Structures are given as structure tokens and as C-alpha cells.
Amino acid sequence: MDKFEEYLNKKENEYNIKLALTDTTAVTLKKSGINKKNKEFEAVNSQESNKQLSTLGDSIIKFYLCSYFYEKKENISEKKKYYETDEFLVSVIAKHYNILDKLDYDSTKKPNDYNYIKCGKTSTGKNKKSHNDHKFIATAVEAMIGAIYLINKDDDWYKEISIILKEWMTIK
């Protein structure tokens, strides 16, 4: 069991891990009283989902990747591009750790697979900004990094994140 998996297994004991693995659709279901997947989770309001943690985690992932590739004297922009994409987070990381089995979400409204679909390119070669149904999975992965940071912020959070992200770079 690697470091990220250890944190995933703390879902029942760590509030921030539980929050990281709670999509907004689960919060909506719980508020309406029909969440059957995780009855014990009680959200006070719609902010109690993984959105805020995801923003924090996304920033930490980018910071770490920039630092890592800078120290290796590699092209930061090119090297980090792959590892910070939603496609990598969904198709590689989430799939490897089977995140969907741990994530609280409304499976009637969201896909229950890891088949990330690229949105395509515009005529000028830029990525289209259309909605991707699998984004919520990447959000959960980013939120987990945010939660891990918060759990370790008074200790050596950088070391914990470093171990996890280095492990991610070896997953195919």
C-alpha cells in the first residue's frame, strides 16, 4: 500500500479526507434526504463538498511539479503539462486507486467509469473549453491532495506530497 492509498483509507477517521471524497451531487442528495450511498455523512451546506479542497490541491500539485522539474533542470512547462491534466488524474490516478468506489456522488447523474473523453481542439489548435462529465473525478483527486496538505500543514507537508506525486509519476 502506497502513501496516497493510506490516506484514502482514512476516509472514516479524517474529516478532510471525507470532504475530499464528497462530490456536490452527494451533498445535494443528502440535503434532500435521499443519499443512500453514504448515510452517515451530513453536510451542513453546499460548500461542504470537495470544491474548495480541490482548488487548494490543484495549486499544490502545480507548485510541486514546478519545483520538481526546476530542480531536475528540465523544461517545467512541457514536463508538468501531462501530470496536471484532468485526463491524467482521471484515466491514470483515479483509475489506479479506484476512486469511484470511495467517492460519494450521485451515480445517476455522473458517469461511473474512467473513460476520460477529450473535448477536442478549436480551429486554432487550442483546447475546447466544453464541459467534461469526468471532471468531478479529477476534482476528487485534487481535493485529496488539498486534504493531505491540511492534515500535514504543521509538519512536513511537502515531504508527504513529494512522496505521493513521485509515486504517481511511476504509474502507467
Predicted regions and their residues:
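Double-stranded RNA-binding/processing signature
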Residues: M1-K172
